[in-house]
């Protein structure tokens, strides 16, 4: 199995980037994984490290939104592998058998289109109306999670995704390409609408393992400003909100 690994690095955080880049150099097999990096206004130290490691990179002097970057990376150059892997720069590989174990799970479940760490989101006001206006909406009513309309989604800081799913859904589509907050759960809903399966699984990757640095913007599709909902961000922990605080347990 071969994959193209994409990662978005941004800002003057050379130690954070050193951690991710070092883990890729140690644990991402070069004969199986092609690495493509997007560098959003990063430090000269990070640029030098990327060059030293020989990773392909795209340098931006502007701090572009995440889904704009995804759109350019996924559709700007041909992807020749059946799978893509995504990393935010605050996630990193911490186990030597990360690739082997994940590959084994995917071979065991060929019907799966996406793999990652699961979280539950309950739709904010206006978001389901946004869903029904999307080109991938196929008429399914909202799923009920915990008794309320919502979606189980892969945390956007690290996931595996079939290349054919990106092309079929034209993801990220133009309606969200300008945004930063909320695309991961809309992608999960797009897959559900199109009968694509998400498999909750993570072996060997530390996710969101840094204090929050990103934009604090209203989530995609919201008709109310929910940014006043208290958030808790702890180093080494994934973020949670009041509406999203209970993590679902999977076998």
Regions found by a protein language model. Give the residues of each.
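A conserved acidic beta->alpha catalytic loop
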Residues: 38-47
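C-terminal catalytic/acceptor-binding lobe
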Residues: 174-251
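Conserved donor nucleotide-binding strand/loop of the catalytic core
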Residues: 51-64
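Conserved catalytic core of nucleotide-sugar-dependent glycosyltransferases
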Residues: 94-175
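N-proximal low-complexity "stem/linker" segments adjacent to membrane-targeting elements
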Residues: 1-22
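Short beta-strand-to-loop acidic/aromatic patch adjacent to the donor-nucleotide binding site
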Residues: 81-92
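Glycine-rich, basic loop-to-helix element that forms the pyrophosphate-binding segment
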Residues: 61-76
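Short, acidic, metal-binding catalytic loop of nucleotide-sugar glycosyltransferases
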Residues: 19-32
